[in-house]
């Protein structure tokens, strides 16, 4: 799959391969133990820890490689290639177990509560594991949306969590649980991209950060906002979800600074040495 003038982003290198392994090592290791009566159902047709690992690998390959593809034909080609590799490497039994897609998320478990004091120890426990079905995931997502609306004083979410919305939310949530995870969300205005990102950020325990554009907003203002963002993330150790829309690109130089954040995690000259 090579880049073309209309699909110039079809570029794949070792960075993509490393992201697959990043996803693999996020997984909850208890799910790979044999004969563990505490292990919940794997999801789909998966019946063994070996097939569970292969299902996880398939999921990560789809997130890293197939999600970059823009046409149904290309996505089908990518999926068939993945399944062919599984069949050739692991055989028919494993292939049959992972034939149905298994989705992985990190927000299925309820908040951890101290049994003695009743206080919440961890409001967003992160365990990257499979979900039994999209229906069970929808129940969790709806509960989180209801909690968000109860705690938010200004913004209220009213997302209809149909299948495609759930899949997009899973993609965003996966990226938010990774170091410097990022996504480019493309769609018509008003389709819910920002609302979905805010819900995913809330579920991940990340602080949603967005600049406030004015007529006089310039590079100096952007730097001040970025300093505030880095102080929240660096000094306070708070997870941050930086939401940046096309309407906020007041100057072409803004994109260069965003690119620096994505590539290195730093902005040259932001803080004096």
Protein language model features and the residues they cover:
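Alpha-helical lid/collar subdomain of P-loop NTPases
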Residues: 1-179
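Flexible beta-alpha connector loops of hexameric P-loop NTPases
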Residues: 159-160, 208-220
